[in-house]
Amino acid sequence: MRKSLRLIALASTAALLVAACGSAATPTQAPATEAPAATEAPATEAPATEAPASEGPAAPDPESLLGKILAAGKIRISTDPNYKPFSFLDDNQKYDGFDIKTAEEVAKRLGEMYDKPLEIEWMTPSWDLITSGKWGGRWDISIGSMSVTKTRAEVVDFADPYYYDFGGVAVPKDSTVTSLDELAGKRICVGSSTTYEQWLAGELEIIDPNMLKPPAGAEVTPLETDNLCVQAQASGRGFDAIAANANGINDWVKEGLPVKLLDIGPIFTVSVSFALDRSGPPTGEMLTALNKI
């Protein structure tokens, strides 16, 4: 049986998930008893019936987003070449990372579903352009770890979540800070137009009863990406903290950058989905196909 893409994604991001696993009791097997030999009935040959051929999905409306993608034989996917470990350029200047692998699998399965192989064209618009909608047909889909928020859902259509994201806070490696309260009024860097910027402003609208309260009166500095924040920190810019994806922060630590993850648990947990522009061609058939993958 083919595994759903969401199941694969969830397994691949196990470090991002909080799961409680209980051990089930092993059932006691009853002793085997030998059944009496069955009397074989005379064989009668049933007339052969041909199983109905399985049909693929109906051809989509040519004016829909899905119809246009299939007609072009190409899907244009927005990504960020500076968002390791989710999407980045490797040493050979090829795209790599969790979101890149996910996008490649989406294109493969979508093409197989309609028997039309799809080529990928990578697009690299800025994050604020992606999250603000009104893409003007410049790309077809965002597969770039976009968190689902009420504000974003007003301008983009979200498919079913493909994983769940934990927010975190990075502090300098030698910092003595142990709580968010100690960051009140401090300098905090954040990626522009991200859920972390919204969280610091007290404007993040997600369903998470355990979302932590942001530090009061923080002096927020938004840069184009949170990776630019940690690079600025490494070059001596001197932020007191960086609000970012917890998995990304752990990656910075592994790379030897001068930060550590503040040990306070997730600041919030949010679902992450593929996004389609609501102002573009109709997205209904594309959403249905994505949710079947």
Annotate the PLM regions.
Residues 17-20:
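C-terminal motif of bacterial Sec signal peptides marking the signal peptidase cleavage site
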Residues 22-30:
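Bacterial lipoprotein signal-peptidase II cleavage site
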Residues 59-63, 109, 174-177, 181-187, ...:
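Extended ligand-binding regions for polar small-molecule ligands
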Residues 59-64, 70-142:
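Extracytoplasmic small-molecule ligand-binding "clamshell" domains
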Residues 76-85, 95-112, 146-147, 164-225, ...:
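Bilobed "Venus flytrap"/periplasmic-binding protein-like clamshell domains
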Residues 81, 162-174, 246, 253-293:
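Periplasmic-binding protein-like
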Residues 104, 115-182, 265-266:
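Acidic, polar ligand-binding/catalytic clefts
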Residues 128-129, 143-155, 198-207, 231-269:
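A ligand-binding cleft/hinge motif common to bilobed small-molecule-binding domains
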